[in-house]
Amino acid sequence: DGEYYAFDIIGLQVINQDDVVLGEITEILKTGSNDVYITKAKDGRQILIPALKKVVTEINIEDGFMKVIWDENQEV
């Protein structure tokens, strides 16, 4: 439980705690400590979201979304 393959995650819509769609995960960056979800926003920006339990609150593969605690204007 809580383990997903990259192909499960890529393509998910990222939705924040205010139900704002932040974008779509386009790739996963592997780092030494935790993965980072590279998310393409509607305006073309890239949002780098760390794959941490305190940030990612839900992953729903069946419905195609990931819920995160993230301000839509937050910079990395």
Q: Which ranges hold each PLM region?
A:
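Peripheral interaction segments used for macromolecular assembly
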Residues: 1-76
